[in-house]
Amino acid sequence: MSFRFGQHLIKPSVVFLKTELSFALVNRKPVVPGHVLVCPLRPVERFRDLHPDEVADLFQVTQRVGTVVEKHFQGTSITFSMQDGPEAGQTVKHVHVHVLPRKAGDFPRNDNIYDELQKHDREEEDSPAFWRSEKEMAAEAEALRVYFQA
């Protein structure tokens, strides 16, 4: 079973958490180590179009995932980011939250991370030549999946 993420089909091997309404996956081109995404299962383009139960689940999952990636990647803080609409920088037409574990000094200026996120999915940089291997992504997902097993 594949997961739909906007125009992309996501293989289960890169998904490390699934709930009734949301899923979390590793990023093919992370801005920092541990940069992952949390998405609603239903392919909804804009945040305003999510149902209340989807909003609740999305943010509960985001909170859980943030705690795990901060610990796993030895972060000391987390940046959560959502671009909602094209003028906000959204390139995949599916609501998603970027979860990025942070460390002191990971960027010269703390807010540089937003510049990197802005460049993250630009067409000229979003090609397979810039992506991690499926094997590397699956290994990371497997390592994160362990934290969510009951």
UniProtKB/Swiss-Prot annotation:
Transmembrane segments: none annotated. Its EC number is 3.6.1.29, 3.9.1.-, 3.6.2.1, 2.7.7.51. Expressed in heart, brain, lung and skeletal muscle. Particularly strong expression in liver, testis and kidney, where it is confined to the tubular epithelium. InterPro entries: Dinucleoside_ppp_hydrolase, FHIT, Histidine_triad_CS, HIT-like, HIT-like_sf. GO terms for biological process: diadenosine triphosphate catabolic process; DNA replication; intrinsic apoptotic signaling pathway by p53 class mediator; negative regulation of proteasomal ubiquitin-dependent protein catabolic process; purine nucleotide metabolic process. Its main location: cytoplasm. The modification Phosphotyrosine is found at residues 114, 147. It catalyses: P(1),P(3)-bis(5'-adenosyl) triphosphate + H2O = AMP + ADP + 2 H(+); adenosine 5'-phosphosulfate + H2O = sulfate + AMP + 2 H(+); adenosine 5'-phosphosulfate + NH4(+) = adenosine 5'-phosphoramidate + sulfate + 2 H(+); adenosine 5'-phosphoramidate + H2O = AMP + NH4(+). Substrate binds at residues 8, 27, 83, 89-92, 98. It comes from the Eukaryota. Homodimer. Interacts with UBE2I. Interacts with MDM2. Interacts with CTNNB1. Identified in a complex with CTNNB1 and LEF1. This is Bis(5'-adenosyl)-triphosphatase. It comes from Mus musculus (Mouse). The lineage of its organism: Eukaryota, Metazoa, Chordata, Craniata, Vertebrata.
